[in-house]
Amino acid sequence: MYKIAKENLTALFQLMAAERDIYAPVNNGGQVNFAAWTEGAEVDLDTLKSVKSPKDAFFPQSENLYTCYKDGKKITIQPEELRHEDFVVFGMKACDVKGVEVLDKVFLSEPVDTFYAARRARGTIVALACHEPEETCFCKVFGIDCAEPAADVATWMVEGDLYWKALTEKGEALTKAVASLLTETDDAKVEAEKTAIRAIVEKLPYSNLSLEGWNGDALTEKFDSPVWEELYKPCLACGTCTFVCPTCQCYDIKDYDTGHGVQRYRCWDSCMYSDFTMMAHGNNRTSQMQRFRQRFMHKLVYFPANNDGMYSCVGCGRCVEKCPASLNIVKVIKAFENQGGDR
């Protein structure tokens, strides 16, 4: 266990940035999101959650795949270069780290997504324990311990100082790179912090949600349930829930005429949009109820059934906070428990 004095935090970013890019929670106009760190950036390690998850460090909201050029009858296809620079994502919370693990299941399974794989190979995650979890948090439901994030490096902010523990080879390499700022220390204060965090988690309103019955065995029962017919009605199909979610991985692929050729890129999409699964023979999900049901069945039934019980939700609470119609995965789970829900 190491400690970095609070007056050395800026020096820490400067030292890390000497040989790698840094992505950190940056306050821009009152909103905190993960962004590339530059000298003078207002890094915010106090705000619990960024507005969007930091998943776009590995799965960008938009990325070029390749460009096609035509010269007479000759067509040249120029693939986009894969990520080859090292980078650090600093300050991820345990739920968002688990979100990356979910993305790994999707993009690192065969056929491997080479763009995602290149970023994962180059990226080091420095996670920050949640000092004071909020009422919308329910990561405990999915087996996540926000007091002890499982990343390359786990850190804790205690009394303004940063406590640092490397957990992987990547973490050890980064630890060596910043060794001049580290002071060896015991873990007494960190253990006390963990105890305090876990005590808060136990009192959160959604910490003891039951996932009983949400598995592959319940597919037909849940799919055919009349609960969906009423539950979906407030949905505006805005897609906000999918864009702030750490685990949503749906994307579209589009072509853009640059004037000098055609650029193919992919960008995030949303299963809540009417044209998401549109096909030539018209077999897309035609109603908002079907799309709403698909989103939550995927997270709670289909994904765990196909991925060794891993749910495609990490309990970050962003959908609880951001949905303009107060619809979210908590309300879905509670509706099937016949418990209602006030959010």
Residue positions per predicted region:
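Basic (Lys/Arg-enriched) interaction patch that binds polyanionic ligands
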Residues: 232-252
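Active-site-flanking alpha-helical
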Residues: 100, 246-250, 324
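Short alpha-helical basic/polar micro-motif
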Residues: 93, 239, 243, 321
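General structural feature for long, well-ordered alpha-helical segments within catalytic domains
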Residues: 8-12, 241, 267, 328
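Ferredoxin-type iron-sulfur electron-transfer modules in oxidoreductases and energy-metabolism complexes
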Residues: 211-233, 251-343
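Iron-sulfur-associated redox domains of electron-transfer enzymes in respiratory
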Residues: 1-218
